[in-house]
Amino acid sequence: MVSNDNPDHDSISKKLARRFISELKKQTHIDEYMYRDIGVNPPQFITQDWIGAVFTAKAKRTAQQQQILAQSDMYIAELAKADVIAISSPMYNYGMPAQLKAWFDQIIRINETFDFDLARGDKPLAPLMSGKTLVIITSSGEFGFEKGGINEAHSHLVPHLRTLSKYLGVDQTFEVASEYQEFADERHTNSMNMAEQKLSAIVSVLSEKKSVNLN
């Protein structure tokens, strides 16, 4: 599971993610569970040296270049093991927090999670992994970010996650959102209840797989 929440408080998206993991553990066998709190331990941002290392043939990389890519290699190895990926994140300024974007930047790497072939025409990029399930758990202070909602035009978190998810090898995606946080009224309570119910339904679907590796 990848969590990107404020480390100073027990955030809503983190609470929902913990509930999801707890229910999934009860209903199915998890072969391996990996948890990464990138709010507490943020990934490194990519640099020109990082890009240079990526585009250097593996056999020709210096010790320094190997060290530069060590974190990326670790994240990719974790991803490769996972059948189910759970990402919990708040919406920051209508989009993805910088730490979560940095995690994707470390993982989406040519010849590791995607390749490039001009023979494919106008869409030369293709993912190298497949068969994974992604559970997106988000929280927001406002509401109506769903398709047709009053804030759909400002929804840049889940659409971004969906765009990038194919490079994680994701074939199936579930979304759970808690909204109205800043309003702190009955609508927020109802939104939380609906999110919890939806997570339980997702667990029921995933439990049919009997055994999973969870990242």
Residue ranges and their predicted role:
Residues 1, 87, 134-138, 175:
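Structural beta-sheet core signal
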Residues 1-104, 109-112, 197-215:
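N-terminal beta1-alpha1-beta2 submodule of the flavodoxin-like/Rossmannoid cofactor-binding fold
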Residues 8, 43, 142-144, 183:
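Short, acidic Gly/Pro/Ser/Thr-rich loop/turn segments
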Residues 32, 133, 172:
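Residues at the starts of beta-strands that form the adenosine-phosphate
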Residues 38, 139, 178:
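Active-site donor-binding loop signature of nucleotide-sugar glycosyltransferases
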Residues 80, 98, 129, 168-171:
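Structured loop/turn residues at beta-strand edges in well-structured enzyme cores
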Residues 116-164:
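Short, glycine-/small-residue-rich phosphate/pyrophosphate-handling segment
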Residues 146-215:
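Glycine-rich phosphate/pyrophosphate-binding loop and the adjoining helix
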